[in-house]
Amino acid sequence: MTLPTVAIVGRPNVGKSTLFNRIAGERISIVEDVEGVTRDRIYTSAEWLNRQFSLIDTGGIDDVDAPFMEQIKHQAGIAMTEADVIVFVVSGKEGVTDADEYVARILYKTNKPVILAVNKVDNPEMRADIYDFYSLGLGDPYPVSSVHGIGTGDVLDAIVGNLPTEVEEENPDIIRFSLIGRPNVGKSSLINAILGEDRVIASPIAGTTRDAIDTNFVDSEGQEYTMIDTAGMRKSGKVYENTEKYSIMRSMRAIDRSDVVLMVINAEEGIREYDKRIAGFAHEAGKGIIIVVNKWDTIKKDNHTVANWEADIRDQFQFLSYAPIVFVSAKTKQRLNKLPEMIKRISESQNRRISSAVLNDVIMDAIAINPTPTDKGKRLKIFYGTQVSVKPPTFVIFVNEEELMHFSYMRFLENQIRQAFGFEGTPIHLIARKRK
């Protein structure tokens, strides 16, 4: 399901990031960061009144060395391109500025709903000053104090009230995949090579309400795929295509919509921090993952090259031990024919269900190999386990005390489950729960 998108715009130092964090904090649960993985909080999911949406802090994308007005124009352009709803943040302390009027003129030309949030209204006496902002011509201003959380509920109500009313349910039989990675790792060439591999290509379809174009194709066995364009990778002339943070944001959006993610690494440049950040986001999101090393034709090789690369990848991406690695060349089409089959196989792993009886046989065998741990004389007791969901496969293990389930033993159980059932290319989640 594609979530509607809300973009926060405004000149520097009006509190965009504070409002972003305040809205993100309204979520019931926020996925924990994987240890050793950091990511810029410029894109997240939020929920209000049972409506979910994606939230973009455009200020996090700015090139700080760019001219002031260019930064603002950049933000507004992103919002107009990406968003279903725009939150325009201004400062109640400073009043209407030339920069605010400049942004308002740009936003006034869009047909997107714009919510005017007057931030830094930190006490009731300041509320009278918000009426000056009617001069921007963007409707009612909403007084907000992001720091204190005052007024954010009203802004969220306005956001939800302006979200698209219908969200199209996607066909569960279609496998959705995307190629992500740093700019210039060869994603576009890979996409074109994959789509040129004797596939039946359907007409491009609008992937969202914005400018992203998805491509459907069918393999020789009749399996349908949707390749999710990382919003503009196949188009020329995208103004911000090489802006790394912008690329991160668009990759995150593509990951959200994907079942399987192809993490593309440039063999000529090796692994960078960006690669680990994006891969960490895909892992946290529970997506199937394939590590694709492109431009393999350019590498001088000996008998140890593949093994050395694989060892380095496993060391750099320790949290992706389950992800297969494939070395390809979009230029020579080396091993490209393997990718659709790998995508299909990993999608099957994502959707695999294990019966409770078979699962518990594996758990009991695991306990026989490695008895449950003790803490202060009290031993962990596992009663039974059951699979509760797919995409990713998630298992609940019922125990006597949740605190006794050490991380290391949970990892041991995960390894035993993988050894028994495979689950290639997909994270699996194990949750310890006290039996009532």
From Swiss-Prot:
- KH-like domain span: 352-436
- Please indicate if the UniProt record lists GTP-binding as a keyword: yes
Q: Read off the CDD domains from this record.
A: EngA1 (cd01894), EngA2 (cd01895)
* Nucleotide-binding is among the record's keywords: yes
Q: Which GO terms describe its molecular function?
A: GTP binding; ribosome binding
The role this protein plays is: GTPase that plays an essential role in the late steps of ribosome biogenesis.
Entry protein name: GTPase Der
